[in-house]
């Protein structure tokens, strides 16, 4: 008696989708005057915002497909993207210029071209003269500037790392479409092909006990908890032993009855004669 298991394995391949996440930037410095201050932007021109240090941090967006940091500028019914750029030695958000390629490490460290020389500086001669009272974020700051490191903190409890995108299993029940798969088995002397139809239900391993050949009509799991049905094919019956009595036709049977009846009559007659004598 042979046992075999039919199992259907469904592989869910999911592609990593680009994510845009909310992020805030902070200053990390040995100078307590600016340490832990947040980065905010202030409008300095058409579509241009310079970055400054403040007690709170502005929420920006990070695109982990293009590795850019940006904000969304509403202009009437349209939305323009102001990307993080460096222009004239000033770190800013702008609708023009080449967006910086930004990488955020596990510890939140922000790295881009010129990030190693970022500093806080005042009196940079900005258009609206905000730097008279606030520290502007610049690269290659001059005398009196305070170097610092930019640290990113994602909003919403996500991990800081964006260098590697992870693919996670879906949390909702997947929807399966009908499919036909072919499974090759090697439990028989000859190769056997079994075709299964996968329906909307999630199939589970089904054990079928069989001897000889068997046709599997369905392997869908039943809604009850009963054991799966067992299908068996009875072995062919053995050859009956040869009969020792020769076959008798109806005519021969009738003749035998007549002969038997005549013998009985003769015996009775003989008995009667004996009594008479």
UniProtKB/Swiss-Prot annotation:
Keywords of the record: Cell wall, Glycoprotein, GPI-anchor, Lipoprotein, Membrane, Secreted, Signal, Virulence
GO CC annotations, alphabetized: cell surface; extracellular region; hyphal cell wall; side of membrane; yeast-form cell wall
Localization, UniProt: Secreted, Cell wall; Membrane
Stretches with biased composition (Polar residues): 234-246
Entry keyword Transcription: no
Lipid modification (GPI-anchor amidated glycine), residues: 253
Function: Component of the cell wall involved in virulence which plays a role in the relationship between C.albicans and the host.
Family listed: Belongs to the SRP1/TIP1 family.
Protein name, entry field: Cell wall protein PGA30
Organism: Candida albicans (strain SC5314 / ATCC MYA-2876) (Yeast)
